UniProtKB/Swiss-Prot annotation:
Family membership noted in the UniProt record: Belongs to the ABC transporter superfamily.
Residues given in the record as ATP 1 binding sites: 41-48
Annotated ATP 2 binding sites: 325-332
Pfam families reported in the protein's UniProt record: ABC_tran (PF00005)
GO MF term list: ATP binding; ATP hydrolysis activity
Keywords linked to the UniProt accession: ATP-binding, Nucleotide-binding, Repeat, Transport
Keyword Protein biosynthesis listed: no
Signal sequence, start to end: none
Example GO BP: organic phosphonate catabolic process
Protein name: Uncharacterized ABC transporter ATP-binding protein MJ1242
Positions of the ABC transporter domain: 9-276, 288-536
Length: 539
């Protein structure tokens, strides 16, 4: 930082235990006013726990150590600002601001006012009023920050412009896409006029193109305005792009700190790129046949929507097939038809069970019901049973009745195949979903699909929450299980790098139509500039 920058935050020898489990161990670092810090690490390294602690969330108090904030404070009205504002008049009441040092978890007198000025963005959790419009959501936050009347409207419009949502002002929040919701959250948090901004994997589950929009909004609103930023990510590129210095967290400990570039380079040395196995796999005859399949919806605003439009496709047994295209191209709808979750509006669909072809357009136990048990599917909006342990989620909760010892052994084996070490797998079996990180929950949901040993596995955006190391492990386990369990995979994705690395063939979708089926390299040659932007260059 430039000379004269003031200390804003000190994290001193912090350890956090949940029961006997140490999740953070002896963590120390400092942050100066206006500085940006990245926290990089694999899923489950302790990044989110640390951010929740810095925000003062219930249950996240340090077991040992201190969190110290240095701020300027108005004794009269409780207004909080950055330390360099000490000695200037309070924005609210005109009283002089005093510089204070707050032991965040122990000085209860100041905690409430400080928490109100700490902004936080979490992955997969959108703190919005679902029934209110984008404008109303932002105005609500501005009113809480003391803005009134025309001043509030002007400020709201300025924020909406900065997050590039002018075309969504009157849309209600629950109808927005994930990336749009994140940008409304960002605008609401900036409306608080925070003295520090905490972003926990803010683009962890978004496609690269949408992630870029959120990143540019963060740059515009946080970095340009010199608001101190702490950002966690399992994507090294995000840390390098958005922060000046970084720490690398692994199993709750800091194993390196330095400039973002130094830390990212060191982290990347540990990532071994997955390469398709050399061994030839015998791809068998067709297992799925679609002929002129369509799925139409009626919408008041847009009339008839052709989500899937006249698709003909054959997928062979033991094949790893990629369904690619930009958001809204029809990939997920087609995957739901293949899974037997959605019936097509028209067309024919057969699924082979043994030597018999099942007509998937017919409902009931002799139609779709007969084949569905052989198909496993993991959607983007997966959900584990919150009040059941991970072991129960992998066994009895999904109707898998096994003797105790065998159930445990099979669960560990399956968890190892999705990137956990044997020790980690043993450890999480008796935990509940809320005790795991978002990335760990995603892998458990993937294990929940694989443990049933389906003949066809459909994965919808499987790499969304995965760090590069886990991504490669999952790629490896897909290839392994196709050989050992003779499984067929359909991977629905806009992560073209993953598809190139993993799939034998791919199909490109545009506006509900299947444009081309061929080798992944052939599909890449057909992509438009816009498609390349959305489908390449993770986060």
């Amino acid at each position: 930082m430039e000379g004269g920058a003031m200390m804003l935050l000190e994290v001193k020898n912090v350890t956090k235990k949940f029961g006997d489990k140490v999740v953070l161990k002896n963590i120390s670092f400092t942050l100066e006013e206006g500085e940006s810090l990245g926290i990089l690490g694999k899923s489950g390294a302790g990044k989110s726990v640390l951010l929740h602690m810095l925000r003062g969330m219930d249950g996240y108090e340090p077991t040992e150590g201190q969190i110290i904030y240095h701020v300027s404070y108005c004794e009269k009205c409780g207004y909080v600002d950055v330390p360099s504002k000490a000695g200037t008049p309070c924005k609210k009441c005109g009283n002089e601001l005093k510089k204070i040092e707050v032991d965040f978890w122990n000085d209860k007198k100041y905690t409430y006012n400080l928490k109100r000025k700490i902004a936080i963005m979490l992955q997969r959790t959108f703190a919005l009023y679902g029934e209110k419009t984008v404008l109303e959501n932002i105005l609500e936050a501005l009113h809480q920050a003391g803005y009134e009347g025309k001043e509030a409207i002007d400020m709201a419009l300025k924020l909406i412009k900065m997050v590039k949502l002018e075309h969504r002002i009157t849309h209600i929040a629950r109808d927005l896409s994930g990336g749009e919701k994140q940008r409304v959250v960002l605008a609401r948090q900036i409306a608080k006029e925070p003295f520090i901004f905490l972003a926990d994997e803010p683009t962890g589950t978004l496609d690269p193109q949408t992630a870029k929009l959120v990143h540019s909004a963060l740059k515009e609103l946080v970095i340009k305005n010199k608001i101190s930023l702490i950002l966690t990510s399992h994507w090294p590129e995000v840390i390098a792009e958005l922060t000046e210095k970084a720490i690398w967290l692994d199993k709750g400990e800091i194993i390196m700190e330095g400039t973002s570039e130094e830390v990212v380079n060191k982290f990347m040395e540990t990532v071994k790129e997955f390469k398709k196995p050399e061994t030839e796999v015998e791809i068998k005859e067709d297992i799925i046949k679609l002929e002129n399949v369509s799925k139409h919806y009626c919408s008041v605003e847009r009339g008839v929507i052709k989500a899937v439009d006249n698709v003909t496709l054959n997928i062979r047994e033991r094949e790893i097939f990629g369904l690619v295209g930009t958001s809204g191209a029809g990939k997920t709808t087609l995957a739901k038809i293949i899974a037997g979750v959605l019936p097509p509006s028209k067309g024919k669909y057969w699924f082979r069970v043994g030597d018999e072809w099942v007509d998937m357009t017919k409902p009931g136990p002799m139609g779709r019901g007969r084949a569905k048990r052989y198909i496993g599917i993991l959607f983007q909006e997966y959900a584990l049973y919150p009040h059941r342990t991970i072991l129960e989620n992998l066994t009895e909760a999904i109707g898998l009745e096994l003797p105790d010892e065998f159930a445990r052994m099979k669960a560990v084996y399956t968890l190892v195949s999705v990137g956990f070490s044997e020790e980690e797998a043993e450890e999480i079996l008796d935990k509940y979903p809320h005790e795991l990180s978002v990335g760990e929950r995603h892998r458990c949901a993937l294990a929940q699909v694989l443990i049933k040993e389906p003949r066809v596995v459909i994965l919808d955006e499987p790499t969304g929450t995965m760090d590069p190391i886990t991504r490669n492990t999952v790629a490896e386990s897909i290839h392994k299980s196709r050989i050992e369990l003779e499984q067929t995979y359909i991977i629905v994705s806009h992560d073209m790098d993953f598809v190139l690395n993993v799939c034998d063939r791919a199909g490109l979708m545009r506006n509900g139509k299947l444009i081309k089926v061929g080798k992944p390299e052939e599909i890449v040659a057909l992509l438009t500039e816009e498609e390349k932007q959305e489908m390449f260059g993770q986060k």
